[in-house]
Amino acid sequence: MAVSLWQQCIARLQDELSAQQFSMWIRPLQAEMEGDTLVIYAPNRFVLDWVRDKYLNIINQFFTEQMGADAPKLRFDIGSRPSAKPVVQATAAIRPKPAASKAVEKPTFNAPQAEPAITANHRSNINPTYQFDNFVEGKSNQLGKAAALQVSENPGGAYNPLFLYGGTGLGKTHLLHAVGNGIIKNKPDAKVVYMHSERFVQDMVKALQNNAIEEFKRYYRSVDALFIDDIQFFANKDRSQEEFFHTFNALLEGNHQIILTSDKYPKEIDGVEDRLKSRFGWGLTVAIEPPELETRVAILMRKAQESGINLPDEVAFFIAKRLRSNVRELEGALNRVIANANFTGRPITIDFVREALRDLLALQEKLVTIDNIQKTVAEYYKIKMADMLSKRRSRSVARPRQMAMALSKELTNQSLPEIGDAFGGRDHTTVLHACRKIAQLREESHDIKEDYANLIRTLSS
C-alpha cells in the first residue's frame, strides 16, 4: 500500500516541482517497505540531505493525507533498494523509449566491446588534470557538479542524458573530463569518449570518404559513455544530425551514458532538428552560470596556490570584483599578474595588479556601466528606457527594473546609493530589496534564472 502511494507521491512532486528540480532530486530516489517504515534510498549524501531538507515535509504531508494514523515512518538511506523485486523508482513516464531505426546491439556498461580502429585515440581525450577535487564549487555551478558527480558514480542511470549549458569558460568542459576520470577510476576498462562536436562531424565525413560508415556506426554505438562538447555546432549539418540521432537512440537503449554541453538551453539551439532537441531534454538539463564573487575569489586563490604563489586576500577580491564574465578570463588575468611579478620581482599588491591589468580593467569598466545595463535590460524586456527611471510599479516594469538593479550590483563597482541614484533617485534599501528579490526568484523561477544568465552573457561578452 505505502509503496504504491509512494508512486503517487512522486506524481505529486512532479506536478509541484520544476522539471529540473524533479529530475535532479526526485527521479534518482528508490523506496521499499521495511516493517512499518518506508525506506527512501538516495544515490549519495548530497541528494539525501537536499531531499530531506527541502521535500520531507511535502512527503510526510502526502502520506498523512492518504493514510492518516497509518502513515508509515520515513527513513532515508544511501544506496540502492536491496530487494531483487522491480525497483520502485521515480522514472516512470518521464522519458519515451527511443525508437531505433534498426536492431542495435546493447552491450552493458560492464562489458565493453572490442574497439574498432576508426578512432582508437579517443580514449586519451579524457584529460586527467580535470578532477572533481580541483573544480571550485559555488552556487552558480553547484547543481551541475552534483549531477556530474552522480553520473560518474552511476553512469547510464537517472541523469541520462545529462545536458549542461552556459557561456564560454564556465567549467562545462572541466565537468565532462571529471566525469570521465571518475568512470575510468571505478572501471579502468570502460570505453569513455570525449570530443568536440566538430570532431564527430569530421569522423563521419572521413568515414564516408573511406567507405567506412558501418565501422563508424559500430564504434560510436559501442562506447560506454559519450561526451560531446558544444553540441550547437551540429547546427545545419543535416547528415551529422541524422547519424547522431541514431547513435543517441542506440546508446540510450543500451543504458550507456551521454553528456552534452552547449552555450544555450536545448530548445533555443537554432539549426538543430526538433527531434534531437527533444531528446536532449529527456534526462537532466542544468545551467552553469557565471561564478558569483565568492566563487571567483576561491578560483583565484586555488589557481594561485597551484602556481605556488601567495595571493593576498585583498588582491583576490580586487580582481574578482572587476572581472566577472568567466573562469577562463579570471585565470588568464591571474597568469598575467604572476608572470609580471616573476619578471619584475615585485610583490603582488593592488597597485601592482592595477598596472599589470591596466588595459583589461579599463576595457571592463568601459563595457559594463549602469547606463549600459539599463539599456540592455530595457531592450531585452521590450520596455522603454524611461520606464527604468519612472515610478511605475506594474510588474511588467518593476521586474525588469529590479533585474537591472541586481545586475548593476553584480557587474559594476557602484555602491547601493549610487545605483539607487541612477534609477531615478531611489533609496539604497530599494536597491537592496531588488537584489534580494531577484536572488530569490532565480531559485524559484526557471524563466528568471534564464533571463539573468542571458543578460549576464550579453553584458559580459
From Swiss-Prot:
Family: Belongs to the DnaA family.
Source organism: Shewanella piezotolerans (strain WP3 / JCM 13877)
Free-text domain note: Domain I is involved in oligomerization and binding regulators, domain II is flexibile and of varying length in different bacteria, domain III forms the AAA+ region, while domain IV binds dsDNA.
GO (cellular component) term, any one: plasma membrane
Any single Pfam family the record assigns to this protein: Bac_DnaA_C
Chain spans, region Domain I, interacts with DnaA modulators: 1-87
InterPro entries found in the cross-reference section: AAA+_ATPase, Chromosome_initiator_DnaA, Chromosome_initiator_DnaA-like, Chromosome_initiator_DnaA_CS, DnaA_C, DnaA_dom, DnaA_N_dom, DnaA_N_sf
Gene assigned in the entry: dnaA
Subunit: Oligomerizes as a right-handed, spiral filament on DNA at oriC.
Compartments reported by the entry: Cytoplasm
Matches recorded under PANTHER family: CHROMOSOMAL REPLICATION INITIATOR PROTEIN DNAA
Biological process annotations from GO: DNA replication initiation; regulation of DNA replication
Record GO terms (molecular function): ATP binding; ATP hydrolysis activity; DNA replication origin binding; lipid binding
Annotated segments matching region Domain II: 87-124
Classification via SMART domains: AAA (SM00382), Bac_DnaA_C (SM00760)
Function recorded in the entry: Plays an essential role in the initiation and regulation of chromosomal replication. ATP-DnaA binds to the origin of replication (oriC) to initiate formation of the DNA replication initiation complex once per cell cycle. Binds the DnaA box (a 9 base pair repeat at the origin) and separates the double-stranded (ds)DNA. Forms a right-handed helical filament on oriC DNA; dsDNA binds to the exterior of the filament while single-stranded (ss)DNA is stabiized in the filament's interior.
Ranges where the record places region Domain IV, binds dsDNA: 342-461
Signal peptide positions on this chain: none
The entry's keywords: ATP-binding, Cytoplasm, DNA replication, DNA-binding, Lipid-binding, Nucleotide-binding
Positions of the UniProt region annotated as Domain III, AAA+ region: 125-341
Protein name: Chromosomal replication initiator protein DnaA
Gene3D superfamilies (UniProt xref): 1.10.1750.10, 1.10.8.60, 3.30.300.180, P-loop containing nucleotide triphosphate hydrolases
Binding site for ATP: G169, G171, K172, T173
